[in-house]
Amino acid sequence: MTISDKIRIYELSRDLNLENKDILDAAQKLSISVKSHSSSISAEEAKKIKNLINKKNSDKKILSINKPSIKKDNFKQNKSPSISSKKETPLKDNSNKKPLLIKPLNKPESVKIISNQLQNSNKPNIVNTSQSRANLTNTNINSKTSQNLNQDKKTFENNITPPIKSPAKPPIQLIAKPKNINNNVKSNESSQNISSAGDNRRLSNKPDQNTNKPKTKNYDSKIKTPELVGAPIRREDPKINPNKQNNKQNIAFKQTGSNRIGSPNRPGMPNNRPGLRNKPSDQGRPGSFNRQGNPNRPGMPNNRPGLRNKPSDQGRHGSFNRQGNPNRPGMPNNRPGSKFNGQNSSGIRKPVSPNELLQLQKNNNSEKDNKDKNNNAKQNINGPNQKAKAPNMRPNATPSSKKPPHRAFSNSSKKPGKTDWDDSAKLEALRSKNPQKQRQKVHIIGENDDSLTSETSGYSGEKISILSASLARPKKEKSEETKSQKSIKQFKKKKKETTRQRQKRRAMELKAAKEAKQVRPEMIIVPEDNLTVQELADKLSLESSEIIKSLFFKGITATVTQSLDLATIETVAEEFGVPVLQDDIQEAAEKTVDMIESDDIDNLIRRPPVITVMGHVDHGKTSLLDSIRESRVASGEAGGITQHIGAYQVEFEHESQKKKLTFLDTPGHEAFTAMRARGTKVTDVAVLVVAADDGCRPQTLEAISHARAAKVPIVVAINKIDKEGASPDRVKQELSEKDLIAEDWGGDTVMVPVSAIKKQNIDKLLEMILLVSEVEDLQANPDRFAKGTVIEAHLDKAKGPVATLLVQNGTLKSGDVLAAGSVLGKIRAMVDEHGNRIKEAGPSFPVEALGFSEVPTAGDEFEVYPDEKAGRAIVGERATDARATKLAQQMASRRVSLSSLSTQANDGELKELNLILKADVQGSVEAILGSLEQLPKNEVQVRVLFSAPGEITETDIDLAAASGSVIIGFNTSLASGAKRAADANDVDIREYEVIYKLLEDIQLAMEGLLEPDLVEESLGQAEVRATFSVGKGAIAGCYIQTGKLQRNCSLRVIRSEKVIFEGNLDSLKRAKDDVKEVNTGFECGVGCDKFSSWIEGDVIEAFKFVTKKRTLSQ
């Protein structure tokens, strides 16, 4: 098909005079793929769309025929006869018919009125299409109606109850009671409406006899399935009583149950409207629609107590039941201009339609309820003196001047035939094709409708009691339903709140019980040096509110999701008694690389065990190792503490055989955590040294966690048993709380009490170490390239980069090319712990190696490669990763948070202390950097611009001079020319040998950058005992009670315990002489330039401001 055969959507909409969305909707229903109004479709598809739209237009034409046939012009014409009939009716007839108020059923005139009405109503004057449609059934219905009317007259006269037959003396008390009066008025109305109601019901139950239209069956089939619910209607039993007399008697009572008049017969409309109920134009045609809430079911009487049938809407041609205003059976449509209204006006003034009563019309179509209501109605028909129930009483209401268009019309100036009815009819017709369940609409009648006056109710000139609208509405049903709904809502709401509160209480109880049962963890691990408040609370088994409260008291405002740095985490954890371990340190303690490979299995031999000595500082680790080595290493260490990892190999004779043991001595100071972790990473057996007089300390617990992370056995050496106050059992008790139970207590942990100074039980300790190592079955393959770990590394000014290596597998030889991390090296020389040069080193042998291109990182694994090319390729990849990691660390260190920015904005520019750090070995650099991170940084920030192992060079001096930094040297020396360059550039160089002193000086330097605080210092107190006027001012004669007064000091005047003045003391005299100060017990004169209102009894407090040095803790 060519493009010329294509048609666009907007062209088709223009041809059909429709909107684009209508065409798109039609295309969607026909499953034609279109996207927008500019989409193209084929001519065949366009034809399908046109057919569908033409079909819809044909349905709309049917709806336009079914509109209300009475137009405004016709309505005006129909209105005049009712007015004329009203005027022509003589008022004197009311006096003759006044007894009808009490017993209207006994008067035959009521039947005559009905017959006259029916005769007069046989003069139709229907306009437009309603006439042609009414003629279809009028011929059949009129004959049937006349027969039924004659039968109704006879039946009505024969079935009048005897108590109603006394017309002479109407009881006066019934006039005063609104219920009986209304009941009588209803009975009078029933005499006028009985024939139309009865015939209407009978004809509606026999649609096939009255019309030959096949659409009536369609209506019956549609109505016989009452799926929908509607307004509460008091109906009779759905089975019509074959005894028509009793049936009519019931109908008469039900119609007299409220002050309603029958359906008005408008002039020009046929009176036999009951026959028009089954017309296909209204009930059977596709365009008609009965509201979902109230279907007219055949066989079900539409006469509820107190409500008349409404034949006007059922029989009117072209009428339809709008959803907002359904045709409810028994609801009259009192339209102005009705001929019947003219008849009624001759005897009784027309009461207003009960549609306007204030009530909620709700659904009640159960047959059981209808039977109960009908039985109540039959009991009420026994006589007019019997009281009727309140729900059946319908008072006359004043018609409101303005009513919603969906209500029934009363005798007011409101005209029917609103245009919005036509639109709703089209909507309902479309919905009737695809019926679906619709939400029931409840409409509330206007509040003005329940105002009752004597002008609209009862006989003319007669006083009548007014019934309140609250009594007229169906109390029982409405109140019970509303009350039940409210009670259910209240119950549900109360239940929901109670459940929430109960769940909250249970959760709190569970948490309290959990906290009571939980024990604080031995140690927490901090991943990546930060944790959120919630994560820290979970690790500490605490509520997050406890962490936030602890931080608040420290001056830190935090939320649950805020991240905390390592220093803050350690501070909070220490408050709750839990030590902190960094995650990278934990990972450093784990053995990540398996030194034994599958190719080594055939050549494995036993190797010496590697033993790491660990414990708290000053617990005697190095002294114990000295006793084993029979040397004096500890005495030669700075400050008497170990600040390096020492690697030693010892020969020990066991069972007539010489055994080699390799010992690693780790620092016990808290700053050397990373060193301890590296020690456990390469160890085979961990020796935990605990002082018998000190017990378990934080570093002891940390060492235990390292050993467990490395999954190595632990041998406990309880040292210093020779000291006073030593208690080995107390140490065992504390260790048992950490799941280290001694063998003599039934556990599996070897514990040996020793004395390093007196060398007690040293041999026993070595035997236990060998026994444990034999159980581990330690093996290695010496016939391969060496693999191992860098224990320590430093830069020697004479030798260059030097690394302490521990060979774990294979044999390391001079001249081997090795890669340690991202550093490539070729072994030039190897030295053992005694300083002797060796050619090769086997498994478990520690050596110092020279020949690296730069200082390797302590803790890295090294491996020997066959040639330099292979090693360089590996090093290049590792160097790239190392640079990325270093850059990420630098970016993290420069990270600025909003809190730090706000601090700088409030307190001015943040002060910084720039440092350049040089140390002897890499481990010392790590320890110092870790300690600096833990210093308070609220007001002073420490920035380490450069840190490396090695001596201080001129390059370091130049960098310090350019950045204003201080150079920190730790166990290192100055290169040649560095001292002269430092003096020339005025660079401060500080050298330290002990880490304690280094950290103290840095903290003092940070405090020196803080501005001092001004603190008030009290000088003395004096009392005013006399006042003297001098010129414009006044002098206070004072007596010094305590301290002294100084000239130009600050003072405050206190009167009646309130400060009334604060300023400077400008004049101080003793007798007539000016003095600088006056001490306690003397009198003096005090004068202030800005204060002269002295009164005897005033107290003068003298003080001055002094500066106080601030500390970082503040």
UniProtKB/Swiss-Prot annotation:
Residues 615-622 are annotated as: G1. GO terms for cellular component: cytosol. Residues 665-668 are annotated as: G3. Residues 606-778 form the tr-type G domain. PANTHER family: TR-TYPE G DOMAIN-CONTAINING PROTEIN, TRANSLATION INITIATION FACTOR IF-2-RELATED. One of the essential components for the initiation of protein synthesis. Protects formylmethionyl-tRNA from spontaneous hydrolysis and promotes its binding to the 30S ribosomal subunits. Also involved in the hydrolysis of GTP during the formation of the 70S ribosomal complex. This is Translation initiation factor IF-2.
